[in-house]
Amino acid sequence: MKYSELGKTGIKVSRIGFGVLTVGGSQLNLPVAEGAAVLRYAFEKGISFLDTAQYYQTYPYIREALKGGRFEPVIASKCLDYTYRDMEFAIEEARKELDRDIIDIFLMHEVRNDPDLELRAGAWECLNDYKAKGIVKAIGVSTHHTDVAHKVVDIPECDILFPL
């Protein structure tokens, strides 16, 4: 497996990541033990980057896969919410459900257009605060939209643009 630094974050990840959505309830709906076994297999093959999100409801799979401390993948999670309070809840939920003090990467999820980005100012403020506290290592935006991508690359605090 080849590994690279993720932008200027200092975070090293495998060039192949694992989208955890697939094992959860909205897709394969695997039992937690079975989904965790799939994740451990990916780790054994060298995959060190997991992509998840609050609404995927896949934290139990990841937590189970990490029991025993043998693997320490980089975990990126995302949240659809707009307000500071809701983003804070999402980060704290991830910390609790993943049994981690620090979240590697946290993103605003599926930002749809410029007004959507602006409406999430509270969520963005929260991400910046949690990064400043050292609770989140890197922050950014996930999007399907090129206009959002063009705007996000000019935001100095944005560590990661995650085009979907």
Regions found by a protein language model. Give the residues of each.
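Structural preference for beta-strand elements that scaffold enzyme active sites
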Residues: E5, V13-G17, S48-F49, E72-A76, ...
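Short alpha-helical
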Residues: Y56-P60, Y82, T146-V148
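Structural motif corresponding to the early beta-alpha repeats
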Residues: Q54-Y56, G68-F89, H109-R112
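N-terminal start-of-chain detector that recognizes signal peptides
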Residues: G35, I47-F49, S77-D81, K133-G134
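Glycine/proline-rich, positively charged
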Residues: S26-Q27, R40, Y84-L164
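N-terminal binding-site loop/beta-alpha segment at the start of enzyme catalytic domains
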Residues: M1-P73
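Short, flexible segments with low predicted structural confidence
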Residues: A33-G35, K78, D99, A123-W124
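Short, histidine-centered active-site or binding-site loop motifs used for metal coordination
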Residues: V20-T22, F43, C79, L107-R112
